Amino acid sequence: MRRLKIIISYDGTHFSGYQVQPGERTVQAEIERVLAIMHKEEKVKVTASGRTDARVHATGQTLHFDTPLAIPTDKYRKALNVQLPRDIRVLSVEEVAHDFHARYSVTGKRYRYIWSCEPIQNPFRRHYTVDTNGVKPDVVAMQKAAQAIIGTHDFSCFCAANTSVQDKVRTVTSLQFEWHGEELHMVIEGNGFLYNMVRIIAGTLWEVGIDRRTIENIALVVASEDRDKAGKTAPPQGLYLEKVFY
């Protein structure tokens, strides 16, 4: 048996998330469907670095699975792409050691969140950015406030209340804002992220940018470890899983 690591990109618009759900269209289900065809209807279990929610995108999601097929990796990639729907693309296939694990070998992740600040939003970007109705935030204030998030903290304040995870300590190594034309990008890296953590951070820092929350308030929110003290969860379509580090 060979263990293959694959990196995929997907448009999350028409998926009910990454993880298999009965009766729903998901990224994992589509990949396992195609692998079953390639393996003569034998089920192949795929493991991802983590799940993404409905309408969330990925440009660098990483998976692994075991296969007995002796197909060269480049041909494996082409075979998958021929049969996968057009909103999923396999970017690379690599044979790895058997102790590699797409989830447990992760050392860090990078996410990107995008707001469209155009006076009139481009309709072709509506599924891939969050429309601000022309509002342009104070990015200098947002960047200053972000400094309170960088570092190792208990991030309970930026975690969905319904999570079952007990240990909420994570390390955010970088959090930057960048203008790309009329789009504002938030790029965040860390050793791991809690459920909805990036979207809650985005929603909270956005409030700083539009003067609904002070720069100093963010440090208080982090120290509170209280979800109710943070802002709203930002919409899913602006979020991208950009890269997984090993």
UniProtKB/Swiss-Prot annotation:
Its Gene Ontology biological processes?
A: tRNA pseudouridine synthesis
Report the domain of life of the source organism: Bacteria
| Xref: SUPFAM superfamilies | Pseudouridine synthase
Query: What EC number(s) has UniProt assigned to this enzyme?
Result: 5.4.99.12
Query: What is the annotated signal peptide range for this record?
Result: none
The residues that hold substrate are 111
Q: What class of enzyme is it?
A: isomerase
Q: Which reaction does it catalyse?
A: uridine(38/39/40) in tRNA = pseudouridine(38/39/40) in tRNA
Give the residues annotated as active site: 53
Question: Which Pfam families does the entry link to?
Answer: PseudoU_synth_1
Q: List UniProt keywords, sorted A-Z.
A: Isomerase, tRNA processing
GO MF terms here are: RNA binding; tRNA pseudouridine(38-40) synthase activity
Q: Does the keyword Isomerase apply?
A: yes
Subunit annotation: Homodimer.
The record's family statement is: Belongs to the tRNA pseudouridine synthase TruA family.
Q: What role does this protein play?
A: Formation of pseudouridine at positions 38, 39 and 40 in the anticodon stem and loop of transfer RNAs.
Put simply, this protein is called tRNA pseudouridine synthase A
Q: What is the lineage of its organism?
A: Bacteria, Bacillati, Bacillota, Bacilli, Bacillales
User: What is the primary gene name for this protein?
Assistant: truA
